Amino acid sequence: MAASAKRKQEEKHLKMLRDMTGLPHNRKCFDCDQRGPTYVNMTVGSFVCTSCSGSLRGLNPPHRVKSISMTTFTQQEIEFLQKHGNEVCKQIWLGLFDDRSSAIPDFRDPQKVKEFLQEKYEKKRWYVPPEQAKVVASVHASISGSSASSTSSTPEVKPLKSLLGESAPALHLNKGTPTQSPVVGRSQGQQQEKKQFDLLSDLGSDIFAAPAPQSTATANFANFAHFNSHAAQNSANAEFANFDAFGQSSGSSNFGGFPTASHSPFQPQTTGGSAGSVNANFAHFDNFPKSSSADFGSFSTSQSHQTASTVSKVSTNKAGLQTADKYAALANLDNIFSAGQGGDQGSGFGTTGKAPVGSVVSVPSHSSASSDKYAALAELDSVFSSAATSNNAYTSTSNASSSVFGTVPVGASPQTQPASSGPAPFGATPSTNPFVAATGPSAASSTNPFQTNARGATAATFGTASMSMPAGFGTPAQYSLPTSFSGSFQQPPFPAQAAFPQQTAFSQQPNGAGFATFGQTKPVVTPFGQVAAAGVSSNPFMTGAPTGQFPTGSSSTNPFL
């Protein structure tokens, strides 16, 4: 009977203990805040976990710890636990503990947990006597409450009127037109600036119509209707890219019959008004007269005066006509290229016409203001498109061997070439270099344009110890270098190719000479490796050279040899 009563009492105590364990502040360990305490610290009356119970036993003095599920509690112990618990223990043992100033240790480290428990129980660092615990707890609660209220009131949003006061002026938004007026004025100013720099504003209008004069330097920039049509002082680049500028001085030999101007080099001309700017005639090509020494074909001694007098007819009345058409030079160039196609056969590149230049070049008059602007270019076209005498795409083969530097007259040819019989072989000009001496009349005439004394060596094949050029295919043509080592340069006569002479821009020879003929007689074109008969060299620098293969002494008058 007594045993059953005791068992019932223990069950009642265990139930009361479990009820205390279920309280909110007792659900965690008092020392490490771990959930689900399993032990009770009977020394202080707190609920702790298993790990902290072992640490509490190691303190000095050791704490008395009991298991909740494996031990029995007396009525006095249950009453003690009811009076204490984790909440009361916190007020006593952690009454002075500040969470902000005191660091909570890492409870995963047993050493730190032990040190924390020693500070807490042995040294009583944060201990408060039980009679003062409630007062201190109430004070801390009031302090924490006031701090919490202050921190919560700090981010509180207050009305603006409370800060400015009742006498603050009213703030009006989105009403001020003065605040928008600077923006409008700025946008209008930007539009005006954009109008000044609008280059493509008048594409729909006539580009050749005379526009309204503008005083700004950038008003007529890239406006192609302003070529020489406005006053020079209105723009810094009044004459920029003026294509009336293909003129030379009247005394010089003109290349393609471009109209000339009588003013001096780099002298500003006042076509549209008084020139008030230094760059008024910038890139004005009328200001660049050519000297007679820089003209093409000026090496000729017998034709230079003739061409100067003949082609000078093209340069007429250009300087005095300030209102002439801007594209008259181009029109003359077009006439030069298109006129005078009458002849035996048309040529593609370097044709030689029969008619002289004077009869081909048509000189249009620039007396009217509406004359063609491409006149000078047309005249140049007529000069280059003179009557041809051969169907060769590059040069003529009628009793003349044309070269880039001049013709090489010879007396006779072992193999007669019919005039206009067919295209000449490639490089068919024997010794056409004006800077070397003429070769002799022997059968081994050298065709090397850079050789001075040709030696008639026998034909050598590949692998010979010579300084000659590599041999080709076909009939061997002898090619010797200026050194003592000589070999053979076997070059086949290519029937589809011919030499490359310059175009004839001056007086035409009857049998079709090259561009710069130098007034010499016309030789006969021979194949590349054939023998050229004795004759007088057309080299202007080798007039007195002997005809032998090995000229001796100072017989050569070439200043470059």
Swiss-Prot record:
GO cellular component, one term: neuronal cell body
InterPro entries cross-referenced by the UniProt entry: Arf-GAP_FG-repeat_protein, ARFGAP/RecO, ArfGAP_dom, ArfGAP_dom_sf
Source domain of life: Eukaryota
Zinc finger (C4-type): 29-52
PTM sites of type Phosphoserine: 167, 181, 362
Biased composition (Polar residues): 176-191, 442-451
Gene Ontology biological process terms from the UniProt entry: acrosome assembly; intermediate filament organization; spermatid nucleus differentiation
Protein localization: Nucleus; Cytoplasmic vesicle
GO MF annotations in UniProt: DNA binding; GTPase activator activity; zinc ion binding
Spans annotated as Disordered: 171-193, 409-451
Keyword Repeat: yes
Domains: entry comment: Contains FG repeats.
Designated name of the protein: Arf-GAP domain and FG repeat-containing protein 1
